[in-house]
A protein has these predicted regions:
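Short, polar/acidic, helix-capping and beta-turn segments at strand->helix junctions
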Residues: 1-228
Length: 228
């Protein structure tokens, strides 16, 4: 929850020298989406956002169908993972922002894969990657959830492993969650069974919450974080 009293930037430093920054910012209500986004991104830059260590940008918007084109145009081409979800900010504004920055990256790669996008942050002994699928074909939430994991199977294989071993966290956004959450859970649990994940082994940390994309027929969207 983004609240008025919460800091807009948090920083962590590890004993091994790793440094991370997390931004959590909400626009002030303005005359238009473009005005709000312009002001929000200026605040983000003033706090040091948008530099080479930017890894993730997630925008929470009030109307992704109408706002997606303007958002892409205004933020420009970025070598970061960019996600957009229809989740209106509680203060009446049209846009809010999460951003994750990782210091000390040896490199960063963003590439288009068939059906989606992968961004890698390279470290000395491992790499972090964020992955998200763009396309869908199944008409229901259970089928779309299975499609998400089938696509992720291929991405994990390209990273040199399997979903059960590499994927640590997923964020799943579900349109009309009252009617589609059951299918989400059935599809996800079926995939976890296929991977052999149990309470005795481990499960992939997973958030399933109300949210929509710019595609009206798309009932689910999943962002995934892995370590390879």
């Amino acid at each position: 929850m983004m609240t008025a009293n919460a800091p807009e930037q948090l920083e962590w430093s590890g004993k091994n020298g790793a440094e991370e920054r997390f931004f959590c910012m909400t626009a002030e209500p303005g005359a238009s989406f473009e005005e709000e986004l312009h002001s929000l991104m200026a605040r983000y830059r003033n706090l040091g956002g948008g530099e080479e260590d930017e890894f993730l940008l997630r925008f929470h918007v009030s109307d992704p169908v109408r706002q997606s084109a303007a958002l892409r145009r205004m933020i420009g081409e970025r070598n970061s993972y960019v996600s957009m979800v229809g989740q209106p900010p509680a203060n009446g504004a049209r846009v809010a922002l999460e951003a994750w920055h990782i210091g000390g990256m040896l490199g960063k790669r963003r590439r288009a894969e068939p059906g989606g996008t992968v961004v890698e942050a390279l470290r000395a002994h491992y790499r972090l990657f964020l992955a998200g699928k763009r396309e869908f074909s199944a008409p229901d939430s259970c089928g779309q959830m299975r499609e998400e994991f089938r696509w992720l199977d291929r991405i994990a294989a390209l990273q040199g492993g399997a979903v059960a071993d590499l994927i640590h966290r997923t964020w799943i956004y579900c349109r009309d969650i009252d009617n589609n959450y059951r299918g989400l859970v059935e599809g996800r649990n079926g995939c976890f069974d296929r991977y052999g994940l149990t309470a005795e082994s481990h499960f992939i940390a997973s958030t399933g919450i109300e949210g929509c994309t710019e595609l009206p027929g798309r009932l689910l969207h999943m962002d995934s974080l892995g370590i390879a």
